[in-house]
């Protein structure tokens, strides 16, 4: 199988299938797909600049709450997933709804999902 054929196969996967692929690759090859984290060099000097504000957020569905069907519909509408994939994502909570979202997008997703009863965390 050529690299182009592999890429074509990956393009056809759903978000949940891609997540499963990443998890299996991590297990098989003993690696992590997590972004590298910078290690702090120590405490900032007195009078130093304020810590830089975080610019990317992961929107995590912690719980669907009482109105699970409304949350599934909202996840489906907000992510573009099919009904089956949206239901699977909600059933697997806590689970990332969106990774690497801007602050505005993350806050908007959080507000819309909390409006239908979901418990959301921003990381």
Curated annotation (Swiss-Prot):
Gene Ontology CC entries for this record: cytosolic large ribosomal subunit
Spans through the membrane: none
Molecular function GO terms recorded: mRNA binding; structural constituent of ribosome
Q: Which UniProt keywords apply?
A: Ribonucleoprotein, Ribosomal protein
GO BP of this protein: translation
Source superkingdom: Bacteria
Q: Record's Pfam families? A: Ribosomal_L12, Ribosomal_L12_N
- Is the keyword Flavoprotein in the record? no
**Role according to the record:** Forms part of the ribosomal stalk which helps the ribosome interact with GTP-bound translation factors. Is thus essential for accurate translation.
Q: Which PANTHER family match?
A: 39S RIBOSOMAL PROTEIN L12, LARGE RIBOSOMAL SUBUNIT PROTEIN BL12M
Which family, according to UniProt?
Belongs to the bacterial ribosomal protein bL12 family.
Specify the protein name.
Large ribosomal subunit protein bL12
* The organism of origin for this protein: Finegoldia magna (strain ATCC 29328 / DSM 20472 / WAL 2508)
Gene transcribed to yield this protein = rplL
